[in-house]
Amino acid sequence: MKIIILLGFLGATLSAPLIPQRLTSASNSNELLLNLNNGQLLPLQLQGPLNSWIPPFSGILQQQQQAQIPGLSQFSLSALDQFAGLLPNQIPFPGQASFAQGAQAGHVDPLQLQTPPQTQPGPSHVMPYVFSFKMPQEQGQMFQYYPVYMLLPWEQPQQTVPRSPQQTRQQQYEEQIPFYAQFGYIPQLAEPATSGGQQQLAFDPQLGTAPEIAVMSTGEEIPYLGKEAINFRHDSAGVFMPSTSPKPSTTNAFTSAVDQTITPELPEEKDKTDSLREP
């Protein structure tokens, strides 16, 4: 097993190239666009420790590359313009002709149709260094759609911000109405709708009783108030619900009916309790 592992390491080290070499790859397309090295592709150079073992393969590769090199090195500027239109990755160098005009003459990209022709830079304004190809298109779109993308997001919050507190106030008021109704209080906004006659029907001062179901002005029924109001005369004589209306007629009716029942009963009950407590 040790021998097999050693042979594997030796094969891996011998197969790896020890000298840096330049191969024809997709990166050479940038050199064609930039007119570097006179637009020539370098041939494949199989440099390594195993080159002496395979002489026929290297000769065949060199013959094929030598046959392809003269055709590749005779590209003209017009051919480079059309070829650059197919590969929109880089902006041309200053010495080259207009890139946008060559792309329109050859194959037109769908992204270029969106930008207006006025925003395309001319040959005199081409930058001397290479940078991303999509930047002029994005700049053209930003200038073209500047009021659409920048003004609409600022207009929408201005319309929605003043509406939000009004909706919340209405919701809070609707939530507060049952909160007051639970304790038997009538909100102040409901006072003009109610009259003194309706309140006298809800709590009869002469009998000291109330109907089984007390109906509020808002239309909500409170069943448990009726049971508590029926026992007002028996449990605690004289207890009554205070009215929130400013009319004095209802208060006088309550006090006149209550005072007649309180005066004869309270002294008798006190005498009975005192006589029972004394030994």
Curated annotation (Swiss-Prot):
Origin superkingdom: Eukaryota
Region of interest (Disordered), ranges: 243-279
Annotated GO biological process: biomineral tissue development; odontogenesis of dentin-containing tooth
Record field: transmembrane: none
Residues the record marks as carrying a glycan: 115, 244, 249-251, 255-256, 261, 263, 273, 275
Coiled-coil region(s): none
Residues making up the signal peptide according to the UniProt record: 1-15
Basic and acidic residues bias spans: 267-279
PTM field: O-glycosylated.
Residue ranges of the region described as Interaction with ARHGEF5: 127-129
GO cellular component, one term: nucleus
Main localization category: secreted
Compartment(s): Secreted; Cytoplasm; Nucleus
Biased amino acid composition, Polar residues: 243-263
Key words, A-Z: Biomineralization, Cytoplasm, Glycoprotein, Nucleus, Secreted, Signal
Intrachain disulfide bonds: none
Matching PANTHER family: ODONTOGENIC AMELOBLAST-ASSOCIATED PROTEIN (PTHR16237:SF3)
Family that this chain belongs to: Belongs to the ODAM family.
Function: Tooth-associated epithelia protein that probably plays a role in odontogenesis, the complex process that results in the initiation and generation of the tooth. May be incorporated in the enamel matrix at the end of mineralization process. Involved in the induction of RHOA activity via interaction with ARHGEF and expression of downstream factors such as ROCK. Plays a role in attachment of the junctional epithelium to the tooth surface.
Subunit structure: Interacts (via C-terminus) with ARHGEF5.
Protein name: Odontogenic ameloblast-associated protein
Gene label: ODAM
